[in-house]
Structure formats: C-alpha cells, structure tokens
C-alpha cells in the first residue's frame, strides 16, 4: 500500500479523519483559528503544517501557541480571550484527555489532532487520533496533519520535508537502522525518493536520534537534532546573557521563512 492509498483508506475507514477534513473545509476566509500545539519537534512541525494548511486552503490566518506544559488547560485558552472569539480551536500533539471537553465551554468548536494513547475520550470535542478505540498507532501528529493536507490536495515538497522531520523527532522511523513504525512506512517510502539527500547516511558523530548504531548518522537526524536544540533555545539565555526568543516560536518562524523561499536546507 502506497502513501496515497493509505490516506484514502483512512478516509474511508476512519470517520474521525473524515470529520477533521470536513471541519477544515467548513471554515471561511474570515474564520479565526487558534492552535495550541506541543512544544517539541513533532508539535512545532505540526503547528507549521496546520498554519500552512489553513493559509493555502482558505487564506486563513492562524495564531499558533506552544505552551511549556504538555497538557492544555482551560486557563491557557482563557488567556487568549482578548483576541476575541475563535471559529475553531485546534489542539495538536498535546494528548487526548477526557477533560478537554471543559475547553468547549469557552471555545465553540474544538478539534484535537493527536497520536498519544488517549487518557479518556472527550465527548464534545472532535478527535482525530487513530489510537482511539485501540486502533493503529499513528507514529507522529505531524504525519496526521500531512495526511489532512494530502487529502485536501495541498501538500508539497516543503510540507514533505517538515513532516519527515516531525516523524524523525518522535522516533517514527530511523534512517540508519531502517526501523520504521508500520503506520509511517508508506510516508517514508513516498518521501525518500522525493528528497533523497536528507536520507543520506554519513560516518559522522552520532546524534541523539542514533540509538541503534552509534558509528554513523543521517542528514535528517542531524537536521532534526538542530531543530530540537532550537526548541530549547530560550533556556540558554542565562548562560549567554542573551535575550533569546521562546525556542518553539523561534523554530516555527524559521519554518515560515523557509517556506517563503520555496527551498529547504
């Protein structure tokens, strides 16, 4: 099964995937969207793809927020009250919790896109998490966002590159050892021939992602490790006496600038 067949199969068999796409399609050009995402590599890559998706599909601007805590709270959402009412709140890569329904008291439409094991299922929020009801493990939220873009017909090379990075960041596959989560394999087989240079294996210093073979690494592993360090950049401020922006925002803005060039490193 190739990647496009996997996306089509998921659309046929997973009603949550279909509902997520219908939610995006239901937005208008003047819609306001707020996205809370995890602050790790997978979360920042997901935030970028969601921002990119909404801009490309409907010309919709998205406010992206990546709080330091994993679980989203009602207070986090309330802090954006001054921004007015949002038409859609997307919670990406921040877990699936039953009490996320509390957020619906202040946000009329909530879509959760996540790949973690659910800690109870919300009844009001819309949830796209292939792990719900003990279904297949989805490997990375970035991949789920890329699948939505693919079904909408708006994914391109920069999205492929960012998705590969997000998948590597959450250990969906290992370029050096060849190990790969089954759910991510169709994407890996699709993206490898499209961007072969990032899958090059080199005999250089191993990265944090080289857990199987410490004698070599891959270009994608090196890039992802740099991005991981970028998400932590704000923690270096005291050591270097610098005013460094919040790491996840720094990385997201870099991705946006990268997408505007139409090229990747």
Residue ranges and their predicted role:
Residues 101, 108, 213-265:
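Acidic/histidine-rich
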Residues 194-225:
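A conserved active-site cap/scaffold subdomain adjacent to cofactor or substrate pockets
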């Amino acid at each position: 099964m190739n990647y496009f067949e996997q996306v089509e199969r998921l659309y046929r068999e997973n009603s949550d995937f279909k509902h997520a796409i219908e939610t995006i399609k239901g937005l208008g050009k003047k819609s306001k969207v707020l996205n809370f995402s995890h602050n790790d590599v997978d979360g920042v890559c997901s935030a970028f793809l969601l921002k990119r998706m909404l801009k490309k599909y409907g010309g919709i601007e998205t406010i992206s927020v990546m709080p330091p805590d994993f679980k989203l709270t009602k207070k986090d959402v309330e802090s954006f009250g001054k921004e007015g009412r949002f038409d859609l709140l997307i919670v990406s890569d921040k877990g699936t919790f039953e009490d996320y329904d509390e957020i619906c008291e202040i946000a009329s439409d909530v879509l959760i896109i996540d790949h973690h094991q659910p800690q109870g299922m919300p009844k009001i929020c819309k949830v796209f998490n292939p792990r719900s009801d003990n279904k297949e493990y989805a490997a990375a939220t970035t991949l789920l966002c890329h699948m939505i873009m693919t079904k909408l017909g708006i994914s391109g090379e920069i999205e492929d590159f960012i998705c590969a990075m997000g998948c590597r960041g959450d250990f969906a596959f290992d370029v050096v050892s060849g190990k790969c989560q089954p759910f991510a394999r169709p994407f890996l087989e699709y993206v490898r021939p499209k961007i072969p240079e990032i899958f090059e294996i080199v005999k250089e210093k191993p990265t944090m992602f080289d857990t199987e073979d410490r004698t070599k690494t891959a270009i994608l592993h090196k890039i992802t490790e740099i991005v991981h360090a970028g998400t932590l950049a704000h923690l270096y401020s005291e050591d270097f006496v610098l005013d460094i922006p919040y790491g996840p925002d720094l990385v997201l803005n870099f991705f946006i600038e990268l997408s505007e060039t139409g090229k990747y490193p």
